[in-house]
């Protein structure tokens, strides 16, 4: 009887351990939700249109809106990432958008020829939420991009940030402050 209880206890511990989140092989676990969102932002190639800094401009799908100047709420960002923007190049990242998932209160039939393109990769709901949290915490409401933000995005080894290094004020890197 004791042996059976010990065996059951080991199985419970193993089952509980399997439910713990494990980072992808070869990748460190994100420090917080915004770091996870930054990784999804990169993986989903949001920077292909919105650029690394979120200012937007010309991209593969046309002129992307500035995420720094957006007035969208968290819920609106989640819907826009998941469902795209009808009539624009902003793709949808949720599998089944406009089919099994109603988007912007519309179905595929409602949106017709204005259906957004399908993204190259679909995102899980928690990934879409992580991107929204990243945009709200690190992009929305910020001033012009700077060296510190660039290094935060690309790392110290990237030469991409050299242009911002020359622009930083004497005394070292600064960070853009979000307005209160």
Language model regions located:
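N-terminal secretory signal peptides that target proteins for export/translocation
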Residues: 1-9
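His/Cys-centered metal/cofactor-coordination and adjacent catalytic loops
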Residues: 27-28, 66
